Amino acid sequence: MCRLAKIISNAGVCSRRNAEKLIVGGKVKIDGITILSPATNVDMSNQIEVSGRLINNTQKPRLWIYYKPVGLITTHKDPLSRKTVFEQLIGLPRVISIGRLDLNSEGLLLLTNSGDLAHQFEMPASKLKRVYNVRAYGNPNILLKNNYKNLKIDGIFYNPHSIKLLRQNKSNSWFEVVLFEGKNREIRRIFEYFGLQVNKLIRIQYGALKIGNLKPGNYQEISNKILEKQLVMCF
């Protein structure tokens, strides 16, 4: 037996919190009967509908590494009709992203069919390392020679773990940035604060998972063995 909200989340429909809202809002049925309590227990024999759509309540959590190209947004529906990551994914079941990459960023984006798994990866207590390669225009010394930790920008605190100069040419510099808790546009805001303009941002690692030789637009599934190892290491 398992709680209804968890089953819906594990099916990749939404997060567990949003699943609870759907249940309370009367959008969920078990064997044709509307259920209003998120704490309701169900098993594999029950037929579950969410907003009129049957879900698979027996699937195992799965995880994919996807190389998100520039120009796609990480959402299922966009009010501005921009191209989304999920419109480009062919051959995958319904998935959700673990975290986000903004429109002009690229690189490693984790996808899963399990809302519970996504929650485990995203919560700050997991302390999963995110590594980025960043190209920026401007004087790198202004950033590197000042204290970039515990910055308060527009009322929001940012605390990158490390920023390291990789190489420098006449107009641009490449940096490695390591975060343990990513906030919206955190890297771009920090660089802008020190007068640098980010013109390329690539996430290359999330936890122990790396982008490797994956090309933009391609994805690969993580084996159960590697997924289990990742979960043991981090949680």
From Swiss-Prot:
Domain S4 RNA-binding residue range list: 2-69
Entry EC no(s): 5.4.99.-
InterPro entries in the record: PsdUridine_s_RsuA/RluB/E/F_cat (IPR042092), PsdUridine_synth_cat_dom_sf (IPR020103), PsdUridine_synth_RsuA/RluA (IPR006145), PsdUridine_synth_RsuA/RluB/E/F (IPR000748), PsdUridine_synth_RsuA/RluB_CS (IPR018496), RsuA_PseudoU_synthase (IPR050343), S4_RNA-bd (IPR002942), S4_RNA-bd_sf (IPR036986)
GO MF annotation list: RNA binding; rRNA pseudouridine synthase activity
Catalytic residues (UniProt): 102
Superkingdom assignment: Bacteria
This protein's UniProt keywords: Isomerase, RNA-binding
Family, per entry: Belongs to the pseudouridine synthase RsuA family.
Protein name: Uncharacterized RNA pseudouridine synthase RP544
Provenance organism: Rickettsia prowazekii (strain Madrid E)
Phylogenetic classification of the source organism: Bacteria, Pseudomonadati, Pseudomonadota, Alphaproteobacteria, Rickettsiales
